[in-house]
Amino acid sequence: GEWAVLGLARYGYEDPEWYTAYYNNVVKYVQNIGSNKLHSRKLTDNSRVIIGLTAIGADPTNVGGYNLLEPLANLDDVVWQGINGPIYALIALDTGDYEIPELPDDSTATQTTREGLIQYILDKEIPGSGGWALWGTKADPDITTMAVQALAPYYNTNADVKAAVNRGMKAISDQQLSNGGMGSWGTVNSESCAQTVCALSDLGIDADTDPQYVKNM
């Protein structure tokens, strides 16, 4: 899967044969479905594959003749599944600093822009306490830190982003367990810890030394 590809590629693992096999599987899948839209509704599938392909240096604009970026041009489709959609679309677009394709002139859909994705994420911030969640009024560590990863490139240039990110990360610090662990959906897990470390790293914060995220040392 794409997360395995991303993790290994970012680590620097070198296995051209394995990466080529992954790429060929993606090409085969895209050509079999005959579409650059990898799921009928969930465009996070496109975003995830774009991230994976970019990690191995492949071109997501030409995968067996299909441009996987094109479906992300429709903001209405991107946000259909909720906040996950724009979070991962923004991450995917920024992994390769990709230009967002233009919608056809006769399209009635909303054109995706980076500004539109950012604003959608900001608008979904939990009022008062800060952070983000799929639903409810309490910040979820996974969704919050994923949102922060998407917004991090704009932290120093957009005051609204900076303020929202700061509120979100404070909410995460407040939820951190006494042993330093993190949990989501009532379960302490390594994935929530990893997402938090990724978010902190994107902000230039050392999770191993920053007093806001080091507990009982």
Model-predicted regions and their roles:
Residues 20-39, 72-77:
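Internal amphipathic alpha-helical repeat/solenoid segments
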Residues 69-81, 171:
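Contiguous hydrophobic segments
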Residues 59-73:
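Short linear, low-complexity motifs centered on an aromatic residue
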Residues 1-16, 36-62, 78-110, 114, ...:
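An alpha-helical repeat/solenoid feature that recognizes helix-turn-helix modules
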Residues 12, 17-21, 28, 119, ...:
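Intrinsically disordered, low-complexity N-terminal regions enriched in serine/proline/glycine
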Residues 22, 66-68, 214:
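Residue-level signal for alpha-helical context at structural boundaries
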